[in-house]
Curated annotation (Swiss-Prot):
InterPro entries: EF-hand-dom_pair, EF_Hand_1_Ca_BS. One of its GO terms (molecular function) is metal ion binding. Ca(2+) 1 binds at E29, E32. Ca(2+) 2 binds at D45, D47, D49, K51, E56. It comes from Rana temporaria. The lineage of its organism: Eukaryota, Metazoa, Chordata, Craniata, Vertebrata. It is found in: Cytoplasm; Secreted. The keyword Transport does not apply. The keyword Metal-binding applies. GO terms for cellular component: cytoplasm; extracellular region. PROSITE patterns: EF_HAND_1. This is Parvalbumin alpha. Detected in muscle and cutaneous mucus. In the skin, detected in cells in the basal region of the glandular epithelium of the dermal mucus glands (at protein level). Its main location: cytoplasm. Residues 28-38, 39-63 form the EF-hand domain.
Length: 63
């Protein structure tokens, strides 16, 4: 589970950060999940290859 990598509180903060104002119903919709993944990839892909390698992922979740 994600809680093996991230604290539950950090996961909750991340979900809240991506919620559209006035629309969040404590569920992630397909469109929101797509946005989350695009932002995550952009933030983690430091070498610009369109992928997140292990080192990039570790750096991303450690920040």
């Amino acid at each position: 589970p994600m809680t093996d990598v991230l604290a539950a509180g950090d996961i909750s903060k991340a979900v809240a950060a991506f919620a559209a104002p006035e629309s969040f119903n404590h569920k992630i919709e397909e469109e929101e999940l797509g946005l989350i993944l695009k932002v995550l990839l952009a933030a983690g892909d430091k070498d610009g290859d369109g992928k997140i390698g292990v080192d990039e992922f570790v750096t991303l979740v450690s920040e």
